[in-house]
A protein has these predicted regions:
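GIY-YIG nuclease catalytic motif and its immediate N-terminal context
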Residues: 1-38, 43, 50-53, 57-67, ...
Length: 88
């Protein structure tokens, strides 16, 4: 079974959403139509990144990582190519 991890970014909000699905096209259409269950509503979005896995467990582990602090840093550095702002 193919499982897809995806990262989308709200165009107006600038917020990222990380999710997994077994049908990427259907899931993105659910986000577009506002029918995505369990996810935040981000409006119009841009698909930033996808990864394909052969099993749910591995995809879920990757999703959990990308939702962590280190994972968000990886997204910023690798996908968005930015550095987090440093407060002082």
């Amino acid at each position: 079974m193919k499982v897809f991890l995806y990262i989308i970014r709200g165009i107006s909000s600038g917020k990222n959403y990380v999710g997994i699905t077994n049908n990427l096209e259907r899931r993105l259409n659910e986000h577009r139509s506002g029918q995505a269950k369990g996810g935040q509503v981000i409006g119009d979005f841009q698909l930033l990144h996808t990864e394909e896995f052969t099993d749910y467990e591995t995809a879920r582990e990757r999703e959990i990582f990308l939702k962590s602090g280190q994972g968000r840093q990886w997204i910023n550095k690798t996908i968005l190519k930015t550095r987090p702002a440093r407060g002082g």
